Regions:
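Zinc-dependent metalloendopeptidases
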Residues: 1-302
Length: 302
C-alpha cells in the first residue's frame, strides 16, 4: 500500500513537472487546485481587494478582469485564465500616491484644456472684431474721401459764384449746402469717435488676452514642474499576487490587468511600443486592443 502511494506520488510529481514546463502559469495555482483539476491548464485568479476610492465594486473589477483575459483568448484562440473565488493568485487594487498623482494630473490637464479653449474662443472673437474694425475703417476712409470731394465741389461753386454773381442769384442754395456739409462733417466725426472708441476697447481686450496668455503659459510651466515625467509601475505581478496601483479609465485598467496576466503566463516585456507587453501603457489602443505579433511571439517562445 505504501509502495502504491509512493508510486502515485512520483507519477503526480512527474506529471505536474511536465505540465508546469508546458504551461508555466500552472505554478501559480494552489496544489489543491492542481490535484482537483489535473487536466485544467488555466491559471486561476480572484479579486481580493478593491480600495473604495477607485469607485469600482469587486463585481465591476471582476467583469473588467474577464475582459482582460478575453484579450488573450481572442488573440491566441486559447483559454488561459479562469476566475475562481478560492484561487491562490489574488488581485489587489491599491490606492496610493500613484493614483492620487494620476488623478491630480488629469484634473490639471482638464483645467489647462478648458483655459486653452477659453483663450482660443476669446482670440477668435477678437479676430472677428478686428476684421469688423478694418471694414469700418475702409468705410470711413471712403466716406471721408467723398465728403472732401463734396467740400471741394462746394468751394469751387462758391468761387464760381463770386466770379459770376449773375449765374448764382439764389443765396439760399449755398446756405443749405453749407448746413448739409456741416451736418455730414459732424456725422462723420461721430462715426470716427465711435471707431476710435472701438479701437480703444479692442486694445484693452488684446491686453486682457495677452494677460490670459501669460497666465496660461505660467499654468503650463507649473504643470510641467509639478508633474515631471517619471516612470512608475501601474501594476505589479510578484508571483503570488497582482497589484494594480494606477489607471486612468476602465479601458486602461483592462489593459493593465491583461499586461500583468501576461507576466503570469511567464512573458517578459516586448520592444514594440504598441504591444500589450510593452512596459509603458501609452501607444496602445486601450479601447479596442488586439494582441500584436510581438505579444504572440513572446508567448510562443516562453
Amino acid at each position: 500500500m505504501k509502495f502504491i502511494f509512493l508510486a502515485v506520488l512520483v507519477l503526480f510529481l512527474l506529471w505536474s513537472g511536465y505540465q508546469t514546463r508546458q504551461h508555466p502559469q500552472l505554478k501559480f495555482n494552489s496544489l489543491t487546485d492542481r490535484i482537483a483539476n489535473p487536466l485544467d491548464t488555466r491559471l486561476r485568479y480572484r479579486i481580493a481587494e478593491v480600495d473604495p476610492r477607485f469607485k469600482l465594486s469587486i463585481e465591476q473589477v471582476k467583469s473588467i478582469s474577464q475582459q482582460a483575459t478575453q484579450i488573450w483568448q481572442d488573440g491566441t484562440g486559447q483559454d488561459y485564465f479562469v476566475y475562481d473565488p478560492n484561487a491562490q493568485l489574488a488581485i489587489h487594487l491599491i490606492y496610493d500616491e500613484r493614483q492620487i498623482e494620476s488623478e491630480q494630473r488629469r484634473e490639471h490637464l482638464s483645467q489647462l484644456a478648458s483655459n486653452q479653449q477659453h483663450w482660443q474662443e476669446k482670440k477668435q472673437q477678437l479676430d472677428q472684431i478686428e476684421q469688423e474694425i478694418m471694414r469700418s475703417k475702409q468705410f470711413l476712409d471712403l466716406k471721408q474721401q467723398q465728403l472732401n470731394q463734396q467740400i471741394q465741389h462746394y468751394n469751387q461753386e462758391q468761387q464760381n459764384a463770386r466770379q459770376h454773381p449773375s449765374s448764382f442769384a439764389n443765396s439760399d442754395y449755398f446756405q443749405q449746402r453749407q448746413r448739409d456739409l456741416e451736418q455730414n462733417v459732424q456725422t462723420l466725426q461721430q462715426e470716427i469717435n465711435q471707431y476710435n472708441q472701438k479701437i480703444a476697447q479692442l486694445n484693452q481686450q488684446v491686453d486682457e488676452l495677452n494677460t490670459l496668455d501669460q497666465q496660461l503659459n505660467a499654468s503650463v510651466s507649473q504643470y510641467k514642474q509639478r508633474f515631471k515625467p517619471h516612470l512608475f509601475h501601474k501594476g505589479l505581478f510578484n508571483g503570488k499576487q497582482i497589484f494594480i496601483y494606477e489607471f486612468e479609465s476602465e479601458d486602461d485598467l483592462r489593459l493593465t490587468l491583461a499586461h500583468e496576466f501576461g507576466h503570469a503566463l511567464g512573458l517578459a516585456h516586448a520592444e514594440d511600443a504598441q504591444a500589450l507587453m510593452y512596459p509603458i501603457m501609452k501607444e496602445q489602443n486601450a479601447a479596442h486592443f488586439r494582441l500584436t505579433q510581438a505579444d504572440r511571439a513572446l508567448l510562443q517562445s516562453r
